């Protein structure tokens, strides 16, 4: 089995996550990519979670084993995340996997992103947040958008609305240097069942 998932993570009850939820005007405070690669006949598995966040060490990124992430992360333990399979054509798993690995290798989390930069003077902005002029930095939702963009551009060229949505978000970043938020990413793509399984 070879699959790729996107996990939209709901915030919990602690004070920091409550503040983030209030500022983003969304329950979703984080989003991650999960790759599942299993060969059941030979007992081999390489299941990973790709995570960009401020508390993930010097570069603000971490590649977890899925089993560890599921056990250690409250939103997974409490089963409050929304998880979708990203539908890719048969035989294209490794193309997308390679893109994810290269992106993870070449980009770091934008540690200039702080709560006070969300919206204007901390006032919520549910769709976009101030981005980084350094093209080697990212946040979790921008990383996940880039994976979606890669899939749409390569395997969904004939889907006009999907391509329009991707172009709109890409242009917004180019023109205003603002990243899409996890909640807005969810709202834009959740109804595209051709992509989100």
Predicted features along the sequence, with ranges:
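Donor-binding and catalytic core of enzymes assembling or modifying cell-surface/extracellular glycoconjugates
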Residues: 1-28, 172-175, 181-192, 196-197
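Glycine-rich catalytic cores of cysteine/serine-nucleophile enzymes that process amide/ester linkages
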Residues: 8-88, 128-131
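Structural alpha-beta junctions
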Residues: 27-30, 106-107, 153
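Activation targets extended, charge/polar-rich intrinsically disordered C-terminal tails
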Residues: 112-197
């Amino acid at each position: 089995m070879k699959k790729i998932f996107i996990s939209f993570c709901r915030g919990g009850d602690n004070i920091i996550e409550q503040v983030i939820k209030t500022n983003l005007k969304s329950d979703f405070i984080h989003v991650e990519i999960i790759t599942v690669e299993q060969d059941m006949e030979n007992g081999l598995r390489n299941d990973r979670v790709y995570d960009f966040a401020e508390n993930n060490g010097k570069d603000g990124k971490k590649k977890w084993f899925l089993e560890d992430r599921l056990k250690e992360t409250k939103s997974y333990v409490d089963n409050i995340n929304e998880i979708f399979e990203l539908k890719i054509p048969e035989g294209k798993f490794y193309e997308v996997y390679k893109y994810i690995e290269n992106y993870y290798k070449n980009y770091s989390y934008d540690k200039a992103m702080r709560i006070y930069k969300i919206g204007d003077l901390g006032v919520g902005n549910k769709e976009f947040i101030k981005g980084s002029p350094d093209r080697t930095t990212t946040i979790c939702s921008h990383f996940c958008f880039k994976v979606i963009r890669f899939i749409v551009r390569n395997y969904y060229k004939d889907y006009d609305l999907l391509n329009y949505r991707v172009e709109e978000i890409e242009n917004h970043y180019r023109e205003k240097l603002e990243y899409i938020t996890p909640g807005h990413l969810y709202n834009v793509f959740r109804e595209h069942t051709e992509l989100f399984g």
